[in-house]
């Protein structure tokens, strides 16, 4: 069963139609975006505007007072404007998932979609900003120039390796959180899945061998987060289109060099998988065969995340090794790794503490909170949304479902606490019970 989400202001309504189409056609997708008011987002006033007095407060002359207050104390922008609940979803359209470099304007539907997800899952308002600049310096300058508008910035669909430098620079030069979700969202969700899959497999993260297929933005971020969780750097082997990333190769950029192996005996993905405990696919479909799975360690963990066709299908992996612990990026198989489990709540916690950054401590807190939620009893409405009688922690359920309303409280709270404890918060939350109630209210 599939579900549709409709948003009325900040209220989420989950609809479970009995006869909802399952195939997404070109005609249906274009009609969805065109019907009624074109696009997927709009701006709604939050203050009264019915009388002349209301309008005089909203604009001239009343608006001068908050302007003067902010000029005197810039932090008051969080008090008198929407900045504290506003994220910029910013892209240049150079690496749009499944579409590639389609350019800034063509990426707008994707960025609007991201803004919609921010709203319905965490109550965050988001503006999509498409920047027509492929040069990193020009892009960085544009984002810095408009940054006072936002409480945080979500970078989206920017190609590697430029995305690394763009994010690094903006993090260093702006006083608000900046996160490239294509990197860190995937890392956080797969990290949560890895923690739980290892527990089910009875293995320690410090002992396992991990093979990552792909060496782009998400792959590098995943490898870094796994190391932060306890994986050993020397136990990670990364591959790209030319095979294993070895230290002797002369065609490696700085990011790939970070995870280059000194084992010169490994040259292919097939060789790397022999005896490996974990495979994380962030490359393209059909890279792994059932025979390759059979050469992996006992109770292997396979995260085949290429979309729409994974590196190996769920059915083929299970046929090769019934005890495999499997995740994909697809909704129609168990343990979907979906960034929507993370980014709405990471930004929620960051905004609510007026954080100056989203740091490693906050990312790890989100990872552990998501992993912990999968071990709790699953509400009936979540089971019903997926046509399941019951969902319980185990091989078929070790990552929470995106429709689980508890995510906003569990993950946002963990991120907010980490922001405060790590020293990047400019606003401290003291009543955590009231904060949890507030978070729940954002979902109606």
Feature annotation, model-predicted:
Residues 5-6:
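Cysteine-centered motifs
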Residues 257-325, 330-332:
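Rossmann-like adenosine-cofactor binding region
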Residues 97, 102-122, 174, 180, ...:
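Glycine-rich phosphate/diphosphate-binding loop of Rossmann-like nucleotide-binding domains
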Residues 20-178, 412, 417-426, 438-444:
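N-terminal ligand-binding/catalytic initiation module
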Residues 181, 201, 304-429:
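Adenosine-phosphate binding glycine-rich loop
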Residues 78-83, 119-120, 145-147, 171-172, ...:
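Solvent-exposed alpha-helices and their adjacent loops that cap or buttress functional pockets
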């Amino acid at each position: 069963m599939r579900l549709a989400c409709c948003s009325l202001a900040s209220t989420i309504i989950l609809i479970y139609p009995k006869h909802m189409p399952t195939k997404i056609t070109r005609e249906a997708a274009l009609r969805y975006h065109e019907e009624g008011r074109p696009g997927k987002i709009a701006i709604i006033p939050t203050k009264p505007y019915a009388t002349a007095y209301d309008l005089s407060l909203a604009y001239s002359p009343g608006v001068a007072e908050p302007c003067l207050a902010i000029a005197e104390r810039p932090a008051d922008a969080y008090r008198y404007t929407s900045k504290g609940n506003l994220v910029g979803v910013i892209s240049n359209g150079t690496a749009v998932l499944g579409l590639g470099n389609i350019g800034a304007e063509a990426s707008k539907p994707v960025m609007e979609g991201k803004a919609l997800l921010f709203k319905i899952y965490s109550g965050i308002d988001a503006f999509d900003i498409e920047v027509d600049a492929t040069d990193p310096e020009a892009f960085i300058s544009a984002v810095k120039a408009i940054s006072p508008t936002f409480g945080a910035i979500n970078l989206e669909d920017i190609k590697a390796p430029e995305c690394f430098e763009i994010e690094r620079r903006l993090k260093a030069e702006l006083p608000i959180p900046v996160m490239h979700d294509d990197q860190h969202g995937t890392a956080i969700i797969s990290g949560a899945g890895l923690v739980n899959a290892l527990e089910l497999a009875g293995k320690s993260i410090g002992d396992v061998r991990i093979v990552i297929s792909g060496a782009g933005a998400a792959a590098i971020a995943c490898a870094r987060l796994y190391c932060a969780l306890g994986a050993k750097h020397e136990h990670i082997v990364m591959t790209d289109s030319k095979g294993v990333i070895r230290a002797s190769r002369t065609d490696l950029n700085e990011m790939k060099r970070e995870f280059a192996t000194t084992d010169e005996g490994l040259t292919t993905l097939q060789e790397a998988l022999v005896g490996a405990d974990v495979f994380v696919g962030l490359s393209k479909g059909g890279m792994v065969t059932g025979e390759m799975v059979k050469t992996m360690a006992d109770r292997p963990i396979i995260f085949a995340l290429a979309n729409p066709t994974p590196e190996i299908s769920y059915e083929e992996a299970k046929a090769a090794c019934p005890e495999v612990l499997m995740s994909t990026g697809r909704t129609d198989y168990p343990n979907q790794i979906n960034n929507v489990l993370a980014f709405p709540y990471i930004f929620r916690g960051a905004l609510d503490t007026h954080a100056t950054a989203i740091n490693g401590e906050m990312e790890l807190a989100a990872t552990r909170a998501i992993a912990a939620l999968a071990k709790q009893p699953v509400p009936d409405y979540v089971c019903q949304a997926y046509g399941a009688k019951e969902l319980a922690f185990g091989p078929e359920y070790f990552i929470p479902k995106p429709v689980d309303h508890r995510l906003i409280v569990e993950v946002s709270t963990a991120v907010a606490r980490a922001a405060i404890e790590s020293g990047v918060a400019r606003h401290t939350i003291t009543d955590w019970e009231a904060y949890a109630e507030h978070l729940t209210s954002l979902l109606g």
